[in-house]
Amino acid sequence: MVLRSEILTKKSELPTPDQALPGRESAMPVPEAHFVNGRPLTAPFPAGLQQVLFGMGCFWGAERRLWQQPGVWVTAVGYAGGYTPNPTYDEVCSGLTGHSEVVLVVYNPQETSFEQLLKVFWEAHDPTQGMRQGGDIGTQYRSVIYTFDAAQKAAAMASRESFQAELAKAGYDRITTEIADVPPFYYAEAYHQQYLAKNPNGYCGLGGTGVCLPA
């Protein structure tokens, strides 16, 4: 087992449940409305909409890329995939929560498809980098897809195999993206929500491989 001190310094190993920070019972307060489109950030969402969680590195740039997509109704950033309930950003950055930075995407399947969102996901980052994304190093930057039903999961896994074949042709390593059923999602602090709309010159580490997912 990796020591807690090694998790703090190396940022490349996930904690065990016993090593994870305890967190808290109270949820993070978040704005009522999306800064860009004014729609509600929290459920209940209108009937007929679908959801997915994408993790593709720093959630600031990832969220902007996703809210710009046709058919996306609303987005929000948060933490998922770890053990610590209602974590803070600093706790997630310590590596001792087990969470990934993720974007909640609420979309209208009449206006876009899950497959189209998967294409955006794969092409917008490098899913072969493990516990990092570019210069952002840490388990919170790992690539993840957390699905809300069996159909989403099957589509995500099929797209991973298809994109892996294209990456191999371009000389890239194996995809490290985790695909799993949706775990508890915890909203990030208010200042992280739609960060790059509030701070247009803010940091964006999002960068793809240049490889395209076949239609």
From Swiss-Prot:
Coiled coil: none
Enzyme Commission number, as recorded: 1.8.4.11
GO molecular function per UniProt: L-methionine-(S)-S-oxide reductase activity; peptide-methionine (S)-S-oxide reductase activity
Keyword terms of this UniProt record: Oxidoreductase
Entry-linked InterPro entries: Met_Sox_Rdtase_MsrA_dom, Met_Sox_Rdtase_MsrA_sf, MsrA_MetSO_reductase
Single GO cellular component term: cytoplasm
Catalytic activity annotation: L-methionyl-[protein] + [thioredoxin]-disulfide + H2O = L-methionyl-(S)-S-oxide-[protein] + [thioredoxin]-dithiol; [thioredoxin]-disulfide + L-methionine + H2O = L-methionine (S)-S-oxide + [thioredoxin]-dithiol
Gene Ontology biological-process entries: cellular response to oxidative stress; protein modification process; response to hypochlorite
Protein's UniProt keywords contain Oxidoreductase: yes
Active site: C58
Membrane-spanning segments: none
Keyword hit for Oxidoreductase: yes
Highest taxon, organism lineage: Bacteria
Enzyme class: oxidoreductase
Function: Has an important function as a repair enzyme for proteins that have been inactivated by oxidation. Catalyzes the reversible oxidation-reduction of methionine sulfoxide in proteins to methionine.
Family: Belongs to the MsrA Met sulfoxide reductase family.
Protein name: Peptide methionine sulfoxide reductase MsrA
The species this protein was found in: Pseudomonas aeruginosa (strain ATCC 15692 / DSM 22644 / CIP 104116 / JCM 14847 / LMG 12228 / 1C / PRS 101 / PAO1)
Lineage: Bacteria, Pseudomonadati, Pseudomonadota, Gammaproteobacteria, Pseudomonadales
